[in-house]
C-alpha cells in the first residue's frame, strides 16, 4: 500500500504464521523474537508463496505506534517528467516520507469528475501526494521545508497541504475509470525508485501507439507502478492483440531496469505465463523444486504462480 515507503509491506509486519501443510500437519513458522538466525526463514517463504505451499490459519503481527505529528502535501506539476523525476529526489532527501503517491493527469481528471471535487489543476495537473511523519513539531517543520524546496526545484506549479479531498480522489481513481470502460486490466510493475521516472515516461510514450486508453498511478516512493489500461470501444480481437504487443515491450523493458512483473498484487493466474517467460530459469527451477518437495501432488492453490 501507500505507506510501504516508511513501514514496509505486509511481510515486514509479520512475526509468525501458523500453517496447514499439504500433508495435513500444522506448523508455526517464525517467532516474536527481535532477531533469529536459527534455520531457514520459513515464515517469509510461506508469506511469499501465494498459498501454494500451505494454508495460513493464524498470523502474529507487529503493531507500530503512529507518529504524533504528520502532514500530507500535494505537489502539482504540469509536466509528467517533472512529477516523476521529483519522486527519487524526495525519497533520497533524508525526510523518510511515509508515502509518495503519483497520479497522472488522466487519473486526476477522471477521479475529480467521479468524486465531483474541484482540486488544483484538475484538468492539466500531475499529482505527487506526499505524507511526512515526525515525533515533534520542529522535526516536521524541517522535513516539510526540505520537501517544499525539492518540489519547487522540480518545477511544481503548486505545493499545498493535502486535505481529505485529495485522498478521496486518490482512493477513487481506479473506480472512476469504470465510467469510460467496464473492461480493462491493471499492471502491477515495480522498478528501483531511481528508475521510476524513466519507466513511467517510457511506457506512457509507448502506450500512445495503441488504441486502448492508458492511465497511470504509482506507489511511487517504493517504485510500484500501476498502469490501468481500458478497452473502451476496441474489438475483442484488437484488445487482446494490442495488450500483448504492449506487454511484449513493457515487460522486457521493466526487467532491463532491474524491475519485476508484480510489486504487490502477486502472480496468481493472471501473470502465470509471464512468470514462466521472464523469470530467470535457475530461480524458476528452484521455486519448482521447493514446491515439488513440499507439495508433491500440487494440491495447494493449484495453477497459481508456477506450473509443474
Regions found by a protein language model. Give the residues of each.
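C-terminal substrate-recognition/cap domain of FAD-linked oxidoreductases
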Residues: 65, 76-249, 253, 257
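Short, hydrophobic/aliphatic alpha-helical segments
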Residues: 26-47, 205-208, 244-258, 288
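Conserved, mostly hydrophobic/aromatic
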Residues: 51, 227, 295
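FAD-binding subdomain of flavoenzyme oxidoreductases
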Residues: 1-101
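Alpha-helix capping/hinge segments and adjacent helical runs
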Residues: 248, 255-267, 292, 296-300
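A short, flexible low-complexity segment enriched in Lys/Arg and Gly/Pro that occurs
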Residues: 15-35, 197-201, 234-245, 275-278
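Small/polar glycine-rich anion-binding or flexible loop at a beta-alpha turn
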Residues: 106, 220-223, 261, 266-273
Amino acid at each position: 500500500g501507500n505507506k510501504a515507503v516508511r513501514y514496509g509491506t505486509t511481510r515486514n509486519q509479520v512475526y509468525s504464521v501458523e500453517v496447514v501443510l499439504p500433508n495435513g500437519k500444522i506448523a508455526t513458522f517464525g517467532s516474536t523474537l527481535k532477531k533469529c538466525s536459527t534455520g531457514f526463514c520459513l515464515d517469509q517463504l510461506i508469506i511469499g508463496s501465494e498459498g501454494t505451499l500451505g494454508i495460513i490459519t493464524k498470523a502474529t503481527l507487529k503493531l507500530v505506534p503512529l507518529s504524533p505529528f504528520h502532514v500530507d502535501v500535494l505537489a502539482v506539476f504540469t509536466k509528467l517528467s517533472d512529477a516523476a523525476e521529483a519522486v527519487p529526489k524526495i525519497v533520497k532527501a533524508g525526510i523518510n516520507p511515509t508515502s509518495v503517491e503519483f497520479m497522472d493527469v488522466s487519473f486526476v481528471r477522471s477521479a475529480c469528475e467521479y468524486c465531483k471535487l474541484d482540486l488544483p489543476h484538475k484538468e492539466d495537473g500531475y499529482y505527487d501526494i506526499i505524507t511526512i511523519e515526525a515525533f515533534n513539531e520542529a522535526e516536521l517543520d524541517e522535513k516539510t521545508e526540505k520537501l517544499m524546496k525539492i518540489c519547487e526545484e522540480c518545477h511544481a506549479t503548486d505545493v499545498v497541504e493535502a486535505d481529505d479531498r485529495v485522498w478521496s480522489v486518490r482512493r477513487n481513481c481506479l473506480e472512476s475509470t469504470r465510467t469510460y470502460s467496464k473492461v480493462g486490466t491493471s499492471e502491477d510493475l515495480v522498478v528501483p525508485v531511481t528508475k521510476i521516472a524513466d519507466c513511467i515516461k517510457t511506457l506512457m510514450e509507448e502506450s500512445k501507439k495503441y488504441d486502448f486508453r492508458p492511465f497511470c498511478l504509482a506507489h511511487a516512493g517504493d517504485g510500484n507502478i500501476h498502469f490501468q489500461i481500458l478497452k473502451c470501444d476496441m474489438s475483442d480481437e484488437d484488445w487482446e492483440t494490442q495488450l500483448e504487443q504492449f506487454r511484449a515491450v513493457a515487460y522486457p523493458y521493466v526487467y532491463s531496469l532491474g524491475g519485476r512483473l508484480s510489486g504487490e498484487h502477486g502472480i496468481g493466474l493472471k501473470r502465470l505465463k509471464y512468470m514462466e517467460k521472464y523469470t530467470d530459469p535457475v530461480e524458476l527451477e528452484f521455486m519448482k523444486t521447493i514446491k515439488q518437495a513440499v507439495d508433491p501432488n500440487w494440491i495447494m492453490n493449484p495453477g497459481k504462480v508456477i506450473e509443474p
